[in-house]
Amino acid sequence: MSILIVKNMNHGFGDRAIFEDVSFRLLKGEHVGLIGANGEGKSTFMNIITGKLMPDEGDVQWSNKVRVGYMDQHAQLEKGKTIREVLREAFQYLFDMEVEMNGLYERMGEMSEDEMTKALERTATIQDMLDHNGFYMIDAKVEEVAAGLGLRDVGLDKDVTDLSGGQRTKVLLAKLLLETPDIL
């Protein structure tokens, strides 16, 4: 099964062609690396296949429900946030679900019987999703990945703007790993 199909992709800047008639497919389980000298189009290629940039010609098709993780070399970290807060952002969609579920519980006393039935079904669905996605293990996951990249030694409560460039890169990589994308 193809995860990614690129067909007849062309792209350039002005009169400089960067990609000419690029075609390939990435199958599930395959490992591919992208290497090249500075300024040869690696970032442009990644921007095209992740949908941030449209190719001049050709098609880029991802299989349904594939999550792509990409660490932008120019990504910025928000001043005032700790390493721990940035890493927990990898699970923001789960925190949002928890807020929705708690809101439903708070409003249940004012609901009709029909509304209550629907709310209970929705909260059960959310609870299953939280359980299935390891919501109650988030802090342990954050600690584990942070330890693996040496960030616990720096201190997870340290402001990200006080970090060196290499440490910031490790924070971004840790967050990306915690997001568990299908394609990294």
Predicted regions and their residues:
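ABC ATP-binding cassette signature C-motif
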Residues: M1-L184
